[in-house]
Amino acid sequence: MLNNYKEHIRNRPYMSGVDRDKLRVKQTAEVFTPQWLVLEKIDKLDEEEPILFTDHTKTFIDNSCGDGEFLGEVIIRKIERSGCSLEQALSTTYGVDLMEDNVEECKKRIMGPNPTPELRVIVDRNIVCHDGLTYDYKFE
């Protein structure tokens, strides 16, 4: 299961799934973090605060989650280091993004290749389209 999930998360072209023309980039100032840098950041977090990944109850929130590159790697690391299930990892992983198409791509990405109805409910609750600066972070 984990290998299929990793493949689903990692084998995507950079910034895939969303049409990003020059005008959109100019209007939204969107910048997407490449996978190599995401992995570097996650490794640094794991080195400095390993409990973030060994305790599956620890919460992660990305206030500009984009297409889920960072959240997907957080989920992989939680599963690898804590032994939790995908459902448990998703239950404590949250994301906010201003752009609806990014939110939809993030949801598709982090649910994995074969999402169950239960995973869809969790992800629909935990990944929301909103302004990360003004959102109340209740995830209701």
Regions found by a protein language model. Name each.
Residues 1-140:
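SAM-dependent methyltransferase catalytic region
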